[in-house]
């Protein structure tokens, strides 16, 4: 009598179940390890996917004033957050690439201080820690030395007393003359007094936290900041500007 070569009934049943399980897992985007009956999550995406984000290493200066500032009578004014700003997340390895980088200004003969103080790392805000530019619309421009991926621009105008700087505009560009690939990443000049275009961002009160602007990883070599006086007087001030980024690939 010829032996029965058909697989035992229980083996055929297990094979059918395993095939069904594999099919279901495939529909869910899961994989099954060979010979295993448990599903495994897909492996992490390969290079080119979204990078892991970590808090950028910001060191804040000591606050120069405390309490809630009095009504500054400035339109379109942002309400105080009332708590510390949330950490800003960027890819690991992002640093302040503006430290000690060259700076030029629309006013190269400041009333107080030197233009180089804009990137010297001193952000305390006390006397001797800031540069004072003349009245009307003025700007400072930082040369990062090469194209960078810019994730955030953080700056302090003057935080010794509460005040609001007017027509604040932050731009990125590929050239020093700001004629190539110019992008505006912040603009609170709501009535286009500066002639740079009306912006939708709000005015804000200067504090020791500075103003942090999300640049979203934009590629640029030059960073320019404008202002047009402040709520206390017609002069323009900069304590420090930091640019958080990394060399462009």
What does each model-found stretch correspond to?
Residues 20-33:
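Bacterial N-terminal signal peptides
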Residues 33-43:
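Signal peptide processing junction and immediate N-terminal pro/mature segment
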Residues 42-67, 106-108, 131-139, 147-148, ...:
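Trp- and acidic/polar-enriched beta-sheet ligand-binding modules for extracellular glycan
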Residues 78-88:
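Short linear interaction motifs
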Residues 86, 90-121:
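Predominantly extracellular/luminal regions of secreted and cell-surface proteins
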Residues 150-152:
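Contiguous beta-strand segments within globular domains
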